[in-house]
């Protein structure tokens, strides 16, 4: 059994963690050449580049090599390389939550068109470069071994992939699927079950194994619209494929799929959420956290005045404006300007409520972090940054700060009230007990696989 994913993102991580919690610890492959994959995941592209030596030491944004006298400037969202005021490159971070660590550098020509992308890994090494013909049209990507040798060249126009390994004949693959199949066979992985979450390359790999004994499962983690995707309909129509089950974690998406599928095909769909490993319990403390880039915090004065028993802890990664600093006139407001990542982590541990009420961009994936720490999350419709983790009954119009305060006050009345509110939050995020995850997968796969 293997887990096979096209990309690494939060949904992939949630599925992977749920499978691990249920006892399905099997090789996990991410097709995307991501230099910041967790240690228990591997990409076919980076596998052939050789082992990275030493501990993780990602490149910080101002360590990107640039020509003399060029300038690097950055904030917590993105960084830029400039030459005499002209933008020459954009630096993308691996993750907001991890600080300004470099994942990719996009180099621009004098017309501002993308010409070259350099990808970095968590050891701070540039391991791949993608050349562009015009703007956004990628031409080829070259992957470099740890000793700087060209190891893989992928032509994005023809689809060919050339693999050069020491003391082995040069190999040419006509498609990415062929390359992935070679990788799987080289590792001699058991392909009796493939658990995958994409109808792109992951599905094509499964489809290429049609006729070979095995039972695969698609975990569909994307929205559905007016019709089912073509490859999903192919699964429903073809009983000869290895994939005969489509698991959908999101309840609303599952219900949409059932409404779009023919009656005799609906049995192929199954709803099964995620098992989240919450970092701690909620202790019912009257401490509310707000992370913000902006001094525009919806309904703040009303909430602070309506809930004098609640301490509002407001943190920013930068200096705060006079408007925000004036909130110190309230005894139940504590401000943290120029807060460090370590300090923010501590604030999550000290708070049991998160208010998603700041305008502007989200800070450090704040809503998800609050959810992981079992904080009760409430917000206004006009300021939401990630509604996936906020129960509908905890979302209010910005003209209703009094209603938000009332629900918050009710949740703080006692353990049962807070438990009920957190259960609603978990249901909305499709949280399920690990026992249900185990039972469902055992019924599909016939037992645990490790």
UniProtKB/Swiss-Prot annotation:
Transmembrane segments: none annotated. InterPro entries: GtfB. Keywords: Cell membrane, Membrane. GO terms for cellular component: plasma membrane; protein N-acetylglucosaminyltransferase complex. It is found in: Cell membrane. Disruption phenotype: Loss of export of cell wall protein GspB; transcription should not be affected. Non-glycosylated GspB may form aggregates. GO terms for biological process: protein O-linked glycosylation via serine; regulation of protein stability. It is a peripheral membrane protein. Changing residue 111 to C: Increased GspB glycosylation, probably forms an intra-subunit disulfide bond that increases tetramerization. Pathway: Protein modification; protein glycosylation. Belongs to the GtfB family. Forms a heterotetramer with 2 subunits each of GtfA and GtfB. Part of the accessory SecA2/SecY2 protein translocation apparatus required to export cell wall protein GspB. Required for polymorphic O-glycosylation of GspB, a serine-rich repeat cell wall protein encoded upstream in the same operon. A substrate-binding protein that is part of the accessory SecA2/SecY2 system specifically required to export GspB. The GtfA-GtfB complex adds GlcNAc from UDP-GlcNAc to GspB, attaching the first sugar residue. Upon coexpression in E.coli with GtfA glycosylates GspB constructs. Binds the GspB protein substrate; alone this subunit only recognizes partially glycosylated GspB, but is constrained by GtfA to also recognize unglycosylated protein. This is UDP-N-acetylglucosamine--peptide N-acetylglucosaminyltransferase stabilizing protein GtfB. It comes from Streptococcus gordonii.
